[in-house]
Structure formats: C-alpha cells, structure tokens
C-alpha cells in the first residue's frame, strides 16, 4: 500500500491532531497521505489504496456508503463509544499502521444492504445500509404489510407496526426489498 486517504471527525480529533500524526508516520515510511474532515469532501477515491476513518461507527458507515462500489478498503479507528465497525482504538494506531505497512493484514468484505421501499401513493425510495434498515408506519392506527425479498426472491410477508432488517457482516451481495401492499 502506498496511498492513503485519512478522514477525520474534526469534533473528535481536535484540529486533526491524530490524523496529522498518522500522515507524518505514513510519509516517514515513503507513503502518500491526504487528510479531509468528512467523506463528502473526497471527490475521487480510486487513487487510494486504503481509507483510514477516525471517528465512530457513524463516520465509518458514512464513508462506506460514500465509497460503495469503489473497492477501496476502509480501516476504522474508534473515536466513538462502541466501535462495532472499527478495527482499533486510538492508542493502538501506530502498531496497526506498522502491521498494515508490513503486509500483515486481511481485507474483510462486509455486506451492504440495498433496500427498496415501494408505496403506491408515494413512489419508490432506494437506500444503502451497512447495519440495518428500519421501516415504520407513517400513520397511527394503521399497520404496514410488507413483502420482504432477498435477492429478488420473496422471503415472507409481514403485517406489523414496523420491520427491522439487519445485516450479517460476513455475507456478500444480498439485497432486501420491501414492497408495501
């Protein structure tokens, strides 16, 4: 790996202090690194071999959605609370970077959900999710009827106040579709 894009949550990494340390470390090892404050500031990502995201799970999800389809791996450093989607905590960054630069890593592919909600009176909404989709009713007193499809095959029909569809981080290429009746 030679080129690194660093995305740093300015609220959690005051003045990009940690991002700047990472950049200096990478450059001292002959690598190229660029820092931005959010994934929306990145206009092109294909030049990078790795995206390093400093923040919580929300920042990792934002980057994963933004770069979906680019095939550039994302390495998350937890600056948040739980860090389900991040790889390391802040104190272990330098050791992790050393391992990455030494080639001691594996790229883990994680599933992204593509969801499509159709409602005859409103139309269609399509979204990408890393963790889950939550679909709820709009009106009090009315339940929703949802046909749930997995890879274009009807899985089941549900009548409920809402539905929660969650991803499994080890599977690939699964799409959920909800069709209101």
Over which residues does each language-model region extend?
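Short glycine-rich anion-binding loops that position phosphate/pyrophosphate groups of nucleotides
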Residues: 57-59, 82, 169-172
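ATP/NTP phosphate-donor binding region
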Residues: 1-50, 91-106, 116-127
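Catalytic core of DAGKc-family lipid kinases
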Residues: 84-162
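Gly/Ser-rich helix-loop-strand patches that form or flank binding pockets
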Residues: 62-84
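Gly/Ser/Thr-rich active-site loops/lids in small-molecule metabolic enzymes
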Residues: 158-181
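Short, well-ordered beta-strand core segments
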Residues: 51, 74, 163-164
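Redox-cofactor binding/interface segments in oxidoreductases and associated redox assembly factors
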Residues: 6, 53, 165
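N-terminal glycine-rich "phosphate-gripper" loop used for MgATP/nucleotide binding
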Residues: 53-57, 65-66
């Amino acid at each position: 790996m030679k080129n690194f894009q660093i995305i740093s949550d300015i609220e959690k990494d005051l003045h990009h202090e940690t991002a700047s340390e990472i950049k200096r470390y990478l450059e001292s090892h002959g690598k190229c690194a660029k820092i931005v404050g959010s994934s929306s500031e990145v206009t092109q990502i294909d030049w990078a071999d790795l995206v390093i995201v400093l923040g919580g799970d929300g920042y990792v999800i934002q980057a994963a959605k933004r770069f979906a389809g680019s095939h550039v791996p994302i390495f998350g450093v937890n600056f948040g609370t739980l860090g389900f989607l991040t790889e390391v905590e802040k104190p272990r960054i330098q050791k992790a970077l050393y391992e990455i630069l030494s080639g001691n890593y594996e790229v883990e592919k994680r599933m992204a959900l593509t969801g499509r909600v159709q409602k005859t009176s409103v139309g269609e909404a399509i979204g990408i999710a890393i963790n889950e989709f939550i679909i709820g009713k709009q009106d009090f007193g009315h339940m929703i009827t949802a046909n749930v499809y997995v890879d274009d095959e009807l899985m089941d029909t549900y009548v409920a106040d809402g539905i929660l569809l969650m991803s499994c981080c080890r599977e690939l290429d699964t799409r959920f579709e909800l069709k209101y009746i």
